Structures are given as C-alpha cells and as structure tokens.
From Swiss-Prot:
With its partner (PsbF) binds heme. PSII binds additional chlorophylls, carotenoids and specific lipids. GO terms for cellular component: photosystem II; plasma membrane-derived thylakoid membrane. It comes from Synechococcus sp. (strain WH7803). Heterodimer of an alpha subunit and a beta subunit. PSII is composed of 1 copy each of membrane proteins PsbA, PsbB, PsbC, PsbD, PsbE, PsbF, PsbH, PsbI, PsbJ, PsbK, PsbL, PsbM, PsbT, PsbX, PsbY, PsbZ, Psb30/Ycf12, peripheral proteins PsbO, CyanoQ (PsbQ), PsbU, PsbV and a large number of cofactors. It forms dimeric complexes. GO terms for biological process: photosynthetic electron transport chain. InterPro entries: PSII_cyt_b559_asu, PSII_cyt_b559_asu_sf, PSII_cyt_b559_N, PSII_cytb559_asu_lum. This is Cytochrome b559 subunit alpha. Gene3D superfamilies: Photosystem II cytochrome b559, alpha subunit (1.20.5.860). The keyword Transmembrane helix applies. It is a single-pass membrane protein. Keywords: Electron transport, Heme, Iron, Membrane, Metal-binding, Photosynthesis, Photosystem II, Thylakoid, Transmembrane, Transmembrane helix, Transport. Belongs to the PsbE/PsbF family.
C-alpha cells in the first residue's frame, strides 16, 4: 500500500471491472424507469401535493389567481374554487 493511501480501490479500477457493469447495467436503467413511471402516472402529483397541469386554472379563467391578504390566502383560494 502506498504512503497516504486509504486502502480504497482506485476509481479507474472500479469502473473498468466487470462486476461494476453487471450491477449498474441493471440498477441505472431501473432507476430511470422508476422515475419515468413515477412522473408519467401522476403519482408525483399525489405524493408531493402539487396540482395537476389541468387544475391550475378554472375553465372560465385565463390568468393566475391573485391573493390580496397574506394570511388569508388559503381561504381566498378556497372561495374562488367554490
């Protein structure tokens, strides 16, 4: 072991090993696919509580709602939605 070495394998040695690519050939596409499905099915909207793109405005409106009172914003928006 060289002086000052932490005992870890060099990065180049890791990424050129077959074991690294066998593991990552499965995990990287799986992570991408899981993220794609999470967003495309709409589960991301439900998990984070954000409105879906078609729920930002009512059908009769064409601009964003303006809140005039800082601490009464939720009640103002609730009144608009009814």
């Amino acid at each position: 072991m060289a002086a000052g070495s932490t005992g870890e394998r060099p990065f180049f040695e890791i990424i050129t090993s077959i074991r690294y690519w066998v593991i990552h050939a499965i995990t990287l596409p799986s992570i991408f696919l899981a993220g794609f499905l999470f967003v495309s099915t709409g589960l991301a909207y439900d998990a984070f509580g954000t409105p879906r793109p078609d729920a930002y405005f009512q059908a009769t409106e064409s601009k964003a709602p303006v809140v005039s009172q800082r601490y009464e914003g939720k009640s103002q928006l609730d009144d608009r939605l009814q």
